[in-house]
Amino acid sequence: MSKDEYLITDTPFKALTVFAMPMIIGSFFQQIYNMADSVIVGQFVGSSALAAVGACAALTNVFICVALGAGVGAGVLVSRYFGAREYGKMKTIVSTSLISFLLLSIVLGVFGFFFANSLMSGLQTPADILDDAVLYLRVYFVGFPFLFMYNILSTMFTSIGESKIPLGLLIFSSILNILMDLWMVAGLGLGVFGAAIATLIAQGISAVFSFLIFLSRMRQYKSSFSRFDRQELYSMLRIAVPSVLQQSTVSIGMMIVQAVVNPFGTQALAGYAATMRVENVFSLIFVSIGNAVSPYVSQNLGAKKIDRIKKGYHVALVLDLCFAAIAFVTIEALHTQISSLFLGKDGTAFAYQVSGDYMRWLGYFFIFMGIKMATDGVLRGLGIMRPFLVANIVNLAIRLSVALICAPRFGIAFVWLAIPVGWLANFLISYVALRRSWPTNKMASIS
């Protein structure tokens, strides 16, 4: 029995906790990595530069979600074949996905580079920060293939039950990004451009290290495989496409929401951008738990251990409840201090009000997001993608409709008031679908 097979041998609580904790810790470092640009730019350059970096966040998240969604399609099949010990098919999926999705990343990177100005103008980015935002975005797209490779390989590692290696790489990358940010922004005075270059270098080095380590790991599984298999690509896309649509649809929705925020001015955008970073910190905890559930479910489905799936789902819900409580207490006690990390002395009272109101509202309702992510994780692991996609579209529709209709008339607060309603609706739809499609031993065969 391989040591990587603990997801199908240890108790569900131990298996999921041991597997999820490095991913949760990694989520903090992921956000430290992401926030480094914002914090350092906000402190050493000013709130306008922070707004420029923040203005890119919704758009860059769309492309990140494409990478993550692509990884999900490959990861579910890798987990299932790994659980069934069909290592040749597993390696075929890995090779096919890397070839296909890296080509896609190059196409998207070229598109983003040449259309950066049009994209940011279309989001109604304030004129005083448009040039900096476009500059940051173009450098970001140059490094997009590295970002794509790193995210797909991280998914591959977790799919075979290895969550510590991505954590180590993420810690290294985060520290490198912070040091490069400090040198280029605070030391060399390169401003927004320096922050973007620092991120590009950190992403590139992390992607190369990830590839070399994963290649070494795959060589341990002695079996023949195809470098590219069209049929396996189709199987992968059946799972990846709904996941890409779900994740990118939500991010596109956030772009539209940002377009609603932008007319309120640079200070409103700075406050909104600050809290979006904080939201991402806590959101990634729940996302990590959901992402841990998916390979756990898929491996146990492949190993025909159906009884362990429900137990694992319950463990995930308990973890979500604990972290939602931590998020609530942290935000209630420290929301002003957290906002000041991003806004600094340059932030106005209005920016602090936007940031604080948004942050506290999220703190009350993060539990809804947690149970939604755990339920979505089970659906992904089982390959039940249609209700998963529908639930997330309903979530987005609620959030967008309230923001678009109410915020321009009644104030910026309506941008975030509907968020927990969308999370709860998403959970209820996903839960009903899961109850109707709960796996039996007949499902435990690989299609």
For the regions a protein language model found, what residue spans apply to each?
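Short alpha-helical transmembrane segments in multi-pass integral membrane proteins
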Residues: 1-20, 78-143, 187-241, 297-364, ...
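N-terminal transmembrane alpha-helices
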Residues: 7-44, 58-73, 77, 102-109, ...
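Interfacial/gating helices of multi-pass transporter permease domains
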Residues: 18, 41-61, 127-132, 192-193, ...
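Transmembrane helical elements of multi-pass membrane transporters/channels
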Residues: 18-37, 139, 173, 202-206, ...
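Helix-terminus/linker motif at the lipid-water interface of multi-pass membrane proteins
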Residues: 28, 32-50, 120-127, 183-190, ...
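Small-residue-rich hydrophobic transmembrane alpha-helices
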Residues: 50-110, 147-166, 271-335, 369-383, ...
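Hydrophobic transmembrane alpha-helices of multi-pass small-molecule transporters
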Residues: 62-65, 177-181, 206-211, 281-284, ...
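Short runs within selected transmembrane alpha-helices of multi-pass transporters and secretion channels
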Residues: 71, 140-158, 166-174, 195-208, ...
